[in-house]
Amino acid sequence: MTVILVLLTFITFLTIDHFYSRKRVVIQPAMQVAKRDALPRIAPSLVGGFRVPENVRYHPGHTWALSESPSLVRVGMDDFAVKLAGKVDSITLPQRGQWLRQGQKVCTLRRDGVAVDMISPIEGSVSDINEALAQNPELARKDPYGEGWLITVQSPDAKTNFKNLLAGQMARFWTEESAGRLQKKFPTFAGMMAAPALAQDGGVAVDNVAEQIPDNEWSALTKEFFLS
């Protein structure tokens, strides 16, 4: 039921965004940046204490996509995802050349023997993987929009894929909604002494969100928010 409500909320966001986009005179194309060997320094805005850079597109399962060329897209996990996942033991990435579908698994996080999948925001063939991240999963927590990227994808229909993702104000709404749901859930956890001090808009969320989640709740909670 929760997943259905989340998806209905996402569809509502897209409908509103489509309505307003029809009134715009100028349509801004997806931002292109330098190749992967010159990682951009993305200046993020803050929503509910979570970093939400404005020049990337977001899947509601908390992964992001950034256009590097008309068909090459870099993919990663957003700040909400890495804080909720916490310190993981490993991140399993797909193979180069593997075909991914938008909305299906892009990688697997493992913590204390429990696995949870992340969803791909884009469809296409895996061009490259972040081997440094596979060796050191902490990179994702330290720099989710930079050195902690997951993969790059050659997407023949990237333009259409990007239309299915959240950007700008819609991405901010979605992150705020996710942060609100997360706050409401903490009091329901058995044995929880107090909810984490998630900051309001403009603040910085605590980094140890995952550490305050009971082990027996972590898998279900991450799968709910990651839509996996």
Question: Where does each model-flagged region fall?
Answer:
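Contiguous, well-folded functional domains in the mature portion of proteins
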Residues: M1-S228
